[in-house]
Amino acid sequence: EKDEFINKYQCEQSQLLYTRYGINFSAYDYNALSVKPIGFDKEDFILSVGTDQHRDLELLDVIAKNNPDKQFVICSGNPEHHKRNFSRDNVTIIRASYNEMVYLYHACKFVVIPLKFNFHASGITTLLEAAAARKAVLLNYTPGLEDYGQHDNTCLFASLGDIESFDRNLNKLWDSEKLRNRLAENAYKYLHSDFNTYKYSQIYIELSKNILGI
């Protein structure tokens, strides 16, 4: 994004100010109120959150096809629209409230974020929420995500559109509780102190003051 602003929009380096996004980590930790979705009966499932234009649902469909022994739960704001994209018995698409999302994060085995190319680091909210719930994450790398994740330390990255890499890393996570726990704990420690709403708003206020000259 920095290169885009400098090269495309002819901004000076000194004109670019930067902050990291943050969430309320306590909203998804072990003490947060969770509610099991009505009729939900899945166990040992892989959770995917979001079905916007930057989610690679085609990749996720292939991954589900390649892993018929695993259950995938996809949370969508418009589940009926996206159900036609998935016809497999091991894929469940639901809409979930905040408290139901807390339940799903805590109950899932780990989280996957299949991404298409984008510049605004799509998926970071899900990445942070999973870290707050202490769940391991597998996602496709896009520019900017290196600020929020470190491969094989706080998460696992797969290249964009790389089905083989995504599938291989997914099965690594599935097979190794030790790996899942290590990534989840490292992600929590790395993200919760600097990527929270308090720190984000604090920096945003300072940036706003600099921009406005006050």
How would you name each of these model-derived features?
Residues 27, 38-87, 93-99:
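Conserved catalytic-core segment of nucleotide-activated headgroup transferases in glycan assembly
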Residues 98-108, 132, 146, 150:
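Short acidic alpha-helix that forms the nucleotide-activated donor recognition element
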Residues 106-120, 135-136:
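Acidic donor-binding loop of glycosyltransferase active sites
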Residues 51, 149-163, 171-178:
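Conserved acidic donor-binding segment of nucleotide-sugar-dependent glycosyltransferases
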Residues 114-115, 139-141, 150-151, 158-159:
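Conserved acidic donor-binding loop of glycosyltransferase catalytic domains
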Residues 60, 129-131:
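Short hydrophobic faces within alpha-helices
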